[in-house]
A protein has these predicted regions:
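Structural detector for short beta-strands of small beta-barrel domains
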Residues: 252-257
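Short acidic, glycine/proline-rich loop/turn micro-motifs
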Residues: 144-147, 215-219
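Conserved SAM/AdoMet-binding glycine-rich loop
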Residues: 62-185
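A broad, low-specificity signal for short, low-complexity segments enriched in glycine/proline
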Residues: 94-95, 219-221
Length: 257
């Protein structure tokens, strides 16, 4: 049997576990965080044009899909390299008008690309779920700089404040890496303090592991023991479990979607 070569369109294939679909709108990454191999493996960012995305979303909605999740390594940097430079807020506005589509989500965002325009789009568009995934990765500025994240703790705190002012009922998820090379107990405590202060709905935590080809592996010494990383990971999981329980307790007796 002949095997058909992949087309430019099929490279952006969508999985369709109806009634939901996960839909890649941008591939690659331009950020080059020191611990991440993605930019080297997947190349620079490449966005799909809005008309193409709308057409395919309309097609899957006709087949019964009610909810789409827009995907990208840094989904909120969508469109900057396209000729007319649309952004994610423009795309959300376009998809919000599709008849039969009930919900729109997107992930994962980068703090430096989370614009006020995008925040206001989430607040105002009725089909866009009030949920934002926004990885902080660490609560110490020196660690963030070593990670090459491109923002400070103070910037991130103000960003979360702006989001919560604009979207009072927003659910925010974040990611944290523990045991990054050189992370001291004091620096880890700053991450705990930040999580306690910002009280995220969900925290995804991972222990740092060297990735061949990344600048962190080339330039930094992985000096935190595996048991030490495991203890820090468990500490965050226990903290977040308490926070999530307290948040959920406030919802008792309410009807929520």
């Amino acid at each position: 049997a002949k095997t058909r070569a992949p087309t430019a369109h099929s490279r952006f294939a969508v999985s369709r576990p109806a009634p939901t679909a996960y839909f890649t709108i941008i591939k690659g990454c331009d950020n080059f965080c020191s611990y991440c191999i993605v930019p080297y493996r997947r190349g620079r960012e490449k966005s799909r044009p809005i008309p193409e995305i709308r057409c395919q979303v309309e097609n899957i909605v006709e087949r019964g899909v009610k909810e789409v999740t827009l995907l990208g390594q840094t989904v909120d940097s969508y469109g900057h390299e396209l000729p007319d430079k649309p952004d994610l807020a423009d795309l959300l506005t376009e998809l919000n008008s599709i008849k039969g589509l009930a919900r729109i989500r997107f992930l994962t965002s980068h703090p430096k690309d989370m614009s006020q325009k995008l925040i206001e789009a989430v607040a105002s568009l009725d089909k866009v779920c009030e949920h934002i995934s926004l990885p902080v990765q660490a609560g110490d500025n020196d660690i963030l700089q070593a990670m090459r994240r491109g923002y400070t703790v103070q910037y991130f705190q103000k960003l979360i404040e702006r989001i919560r002012v604009a979207i009072p009922n927003v659910a925010i998820a974040t990611d944290v890496i523990v045991g990054f090379p050189g992370e001291t107990r004091e620096q880890f405590q700053k991450t705990l303090d930040l999580l306690s202060d910002l009280r995220f709905d969900t925290v995804h935590v991972a222990a740092y592991s060297p990735r061949q080809g990344t600048s962190a592996t080339k330039e930094l010494t992985d000096n935190i023991s595996l048991p030490g990383k495991s203890r820090r990971l468990q500490t965050i999981e226990e903290l977040q479990s308490r926070i999530a329980s307290e948040i959920n307790a406030q919802l008792q007796g309410q009807t929520v979607e």
